[in-house]
Amino acid sequence: MATTPPPADAPRHVPVLRDRCVNLLAPAIEAANLAGRRAVVVDATLGMGGHSEAMLTRFENLHLIGIDRDTQALDLSGARLKPFEDRTDLVHAVYDEITEVLDDLGFESIDGVLMDLGVSSLQLDEAERGFAYSYDAPLDMRMDTSRGQSAADVVNSYSETELVSIIRRWGEEKFAGRIANRIVAARAEKPFAGTGELVEVIRKAVPAAAARTGGHPAKRTFQALRIEVNEELVVLERAVPAAVDALAIGGRAVVMSYHSLEDKIVKKFFSTGVTSSAPPGFPVELDSQKPELKTLTKGTEVPTEAEIAENPRAASARLRAVERIRPRRTS
């Protein structure tokens, strides 16, 4: 296992599916401009600001609200977006707090929202954050390092039953029982402090045949711990409805997910919005029962070979987008 991260002077980060995301949001931004008002778009997972930079560069009248729970990301994106500081509001918050953020800034509705879910390149590449299993680091995994329990807290304090549950549920790991058992046995000797020691315990718990064919043996467990530490799926279940509710008529929501658990949540909510709420077989569809959203993507879209070549981390991305076509249903 490597003990140091990649060099700090690595090539400039290329946002996942940048052009496709911007193109999906473009009609809503342009429609606002044609209506004589400044479009407002929320980048709900700002990260290093690459998607926001692309939008602000392309649309000179756009006002962008960037939200991130990671203060380091806000600092870096703030520097990147400094040329546009008169058209941006960058906010330290979790993206399920979008309603409160908009209220605080005085915006009643927005024309677009972008969510790029999961862990960011910044978090993966910063060794001391503890997100990666490829090199040793403190076992942290918090997206907001100023609050909340760390991954070390989870592996050292959760019962074996609780560990089995989260590793199986959030990591979809079929060897969850073996891994949890080994973790509990190892921590009885010495509490976990670093990612390296956890990786070694997981490696020994996963059968050799499975380790040879299923990718890195720690991948699913690390995903589970990260989701648990940051309450990612709980946040997502609140964030998607809040973001879509904030859309003006013609506004668009673009969401990129990276594993099936995220995509299922997004798919379920979008499917409800694009479907009539009238009872099956009911002879009349009231206006209040008509779909409030329109699908912009054919199911879930995946990256092209060219997009993966531009950013290999795009390989697992799944993209969904909708447009608000009617006011929000109230019942």
UniProtKB/Swiss-Prot annotation:
Signal peptide: none annotated. It is an enzyme of class 2 (transferase). It is found in: Cytoplasm. The keyword rRNA processing applies. Specifically methylates the N4 position of cytidine in position 1402 (C1402) of 16S rRNA. PANTHER family: 12S RRNA N4-METHYLCYTIDINE METHYLTRANSFERASE (PTHR11265:SF0), S-ADENOSYL-METHYLTRANSFERASE MRAW (PTHR11265). HAMAP family: 16SrRNA_methyltr_H. This is Ribosomal RNA small subunit methyltransferase H.
